[in-house]
UniProtKB/Swiss-Prot annotation:
Tissue: Expressed in the perivenular areas (centrilobular) of the liver (at protein level).
Gene designation: SLCO1B3-SLCO1B7
Annotated glycan sites: 134, 151, 503, 516, 617
Protein name: SLCO1B3-SLCO1B7 readthrough transcript protein
SUPFAM superfamilies hit by this protein: Kazal-type serine protease inhibitors (SSF100895), MFS general substrate transporter (SSF103473)
Family the entry assigns: Belongs to the organo anion transporter (TC 2.A.60) family.
Topological domain spans for side Extracellular: 51-63, 118-170, 228-258, 361-376, 431-539, 590-624
Main localisation: endoplasmic reticulum
Record site: Reactive bond: 467-468
Protein keywords: Cell membrane, Disulfide bond, Endoplasmic reticulum, Glycoprotein, Lipid transport, Membrane, Protease inhibitor, Serine protease inhibitor, Transmembrane, Transmembrane helix, Transport
Amino acid sequence: MDQHQHLNKTAESASSEKKKTRRCNGFKMFLAALSFSYIAKALGGIIMKISITQIERRFDISSSLAGLIDGSFEIGNLLVIVFVSYFGSKLHRPKLIGIGCLLMGTGSILTSLPHFFMGYYRYSKETNIDPSENSTSNLPNCLINQMLSLNRTPSEIIERGCVKESGSHMWIYVFMGNMLRGIGETPIVPLGISYIDDFAKEGHSSLYLGTVNVMGMTGLVFAFMLGSLFAKMYVDIGYVDLSTIRITPKDSRWVGAWWLGFLVSGIVSIISSIPFFFLPLNPNKPQKERKVSLFLHVLKTNDKRNQIANLTNRRKYITKNVTGFFQSLKSILTNPLYVIFVIFTLLHMSSYIASLTYIIKMVEQQYGWSASKTNFLLGVLALPAVAIGMFSGGYIIKKFKLSLVGLAKLAFCSATVHLLSQVLYFFLICESKSVAGLTLTYDGNSPVRSHVDVPLSYCNSECNCDESQWEPVCGNNGITYLSPCLAGCKSSSGNKEPIVFYNCSCVEVIGLQNKNYSAHLGECPRDDACTRKSYVYFVIQVLDAFLCAVGLTSYSVLVIRIVQPELKALAIGFHSMIMRSLGGILVPIYFGALIDTTCMKWSTNSCGARGACRIYNSTYLGRAFFGLKVALIFPVLVLLTVFIFVVRKKSHGKDTKVLENERQVMDEANLEFLNDSEHFVPSAEEQ
């Protein structure tokens, strides 16, 4: 008898061990798959952000339209967020995440497809009708009393080239691909977090969530490194002879291999989807048990009485839920602390979203840095500063057990640092370049009041130049000219590197003592003073990134503490919806429209319509961009002051229900911080 009991115990122990091993292995596989999907998610998101300027140039569109394309991700996300939030927990979560990753990858690949159907990139459309010929032999010189065949009028360009550019609306595919990526990314975070929270060992959820978010951070670094590499590559690499390409990555017309980034991220996303289709709905149950449960469920649902009862109960349940939803929504919208919180976080995050979207354009126009260099420094310096700042902020909150007032003060410090950094940037704005025909007269002797319709000078009036051309050359006098023809250059060194133009009459007007009236291809570089400002600018960016990330961690905890526990999920969801709709969608559009107002020279596409901007007034651009950011951040300080005042007033009054449970929700708040941290990271990683 004893031996029989011993054998039974041994068998039960072995069975228990097998179940634990099966559960552990299934959960570990899910954790590994989710970590990989976080890497894919981060890769796709950052590739889009750092490619937006290149997309703008490739498709010859304005910054505001490029901002709309960037915001299409949030549009896609909003289309399905309600469906995923409601039905996600009732369906097979791993498979739903796998479908999301598959859609995310498909969207990224769709985004890259226009590259293969648009033909070769023509960076000099005004002077070059054949898209396969970007060689230096097509550069226009000044031929007095003669009309160059290459200097065609706009009507000739339209007649011969407009039909060839029938793919000018291919940006719509980029829009749709980015929207599809937004749809696909929706289930990854909420369903992944809930799965971990349901099946992780008690007390281990925070550790697992931290691990997943760290993997997401590595994806961000990887994305910036890839972006830096692809930005160096010419867009048509592998299709054209690169020795004939006369522009460099510092040229405002340069377009890197933007499509490669989307191809890579798309493939990675599709690969990341595969493991989820082989994971169980519940890692605690073996396959046989799940099949039996499913069979019993089918038998029950075949019972007509049960169906009628279930239908009646379901109607009551839905009615109760709808009524409860609107009551809950009314409750959070009549909570003054929550309303103030939503407004100031929207304003604060809008500033970060604008910076992330347009930082490459800003640095390029202000300091002449290439996109490749900017991406590299962001990935190596700014992004780690954000990561360290966020973990430091979480540590400070937990170590000092900050109250609601303490969290608000931490957020106030973050906003103050960000505001001061924007004010400092005003002193780091470089003067606009000296460009004949835009900021100076063509002879280079006098500034102009407006860059519109600057009259020709006697040094180039007989050259029969096309004033719409943008083929900049830098004269020995330090002035940039719109083209060799408008500089009055009579000859060139041909295809030899570097390309030099000689006998430039507009350069001669300045009266150089060495009589070397020449110009070389490309815009004139920034002076040493501006270069020094660029280094100071980036140091402030990194410090701002760290200090602001420390404060931004308080937002994830604040949203939990200011509402009742049962309204937490709704409060977070509504806040996320506002951030996406009014922040993620609108901010790139209205900041892009503001940037467009500072453009001095627009390209003209083959149909005679306005294309992408070639050069901005860097002074006006800096003032407008940083000025709008200051206008967004200053009200944040005012609202945070009001927030702190209201909290203190409540803490001394009778209504202390919101504050009573602060200590009890600390662990839960830290868990939610790990859940929501990726929502704040992309908006701050360049700061």
